[in-house]
């Protein structure tokens, strides 16, 4: 709740604009500052500051809920977007959760985009076929979205649907693709998305990838600007997930100290790791690729070997491998080039 944007809290526009001009953008930004500091920064009197802080506190503070009401809400909304990977869905207690931020992190070419494409199809499918029967917003920052691969996954996974006349076009037409090329464009797109979600019955938001935008931005920024550039879209995505109660999935890249390291780390740092609700690590070692549940409030740390097929990602076993200690958070990239070269010959798999 602390990440709610002040611009959406119903403050007088003149005061909301002053907050924005001083880069005080979220409830946390405002409530972390003493009253006199806010008066000095905003150049307004104490009464205005107190009124604004009271309003921000009221909006940001979550209402009291009983465990029963939370359970009833979860049962009413369904709560999850199933991935159709039986072992993973079972471990995640149903799939990708509604109202939360789920991160997919791993090296390029491991299968993150393949996973995202399948999720997009699953959200667009009619309810009678187990889908969410809605639209999908797919923010493609690296131009890795391929409509031909999307249809290929659909026809291989759901031939009874996609071989029907006009169904492939209908499913593809439910997926809205945006291609922001900079942080400013990404931020502008995110600010427009809240209204789009309400108007167009959007059931899933995918950002593939957040890191790609921030890499170039960070190269041009100071340390303080780097933290701010990461904080703004992250705060908005968390607020958007809570507000819309749809699943939001973001992909993240990895980094290493040099080109010879086997163990890699997420490109985004500690702040990002704490913000996401679910973290799924995509890694390669022992001659196989794995999806690993690295962070989840309800699931064990467990890894599943997988491969990429014409129908998308497929688990080699629904029985996961227990992960302990440092293995829970590390990302191994052993022999990934060999795995990619030896994969089935689909032209769009390197994502």
Regions found by a protein language model. Give the residues of each.
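Phosphate-binding/switch region of NTP-binding enzymes
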Residues: 227-348
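Amphipathic alpha-helical transducer elements in NTP-driven molecular machines
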Residues: 82-85, 98, 113-114, 144-147, ...
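Solvent-exposed alpha-helical segments within well-ordered globular domains of core cellular machineries
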Residues: 17, 32, 36, 40, ...
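The Walker A/P-loop phosphate-binding site
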Residues: 18, 37, 41-42, 52-163, ...
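Compact, charge-rich alpha-helical regulatory domains located at protein termini
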Residues: 1-67
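Conserved inter-motif catalytic segment of the P-loop NTP-binding fold
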Residues: 131-223
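Hydrophobic/aromatic beta-strand patches that form the interior of the parallel beta-sheet core
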Residues: 102-104, 137-139, 176-178, 249, ...
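Conserved, well-folded catalytic cores of nucleic-acid-processing
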Residues: 55, 59-62, 91-95, 107, ...
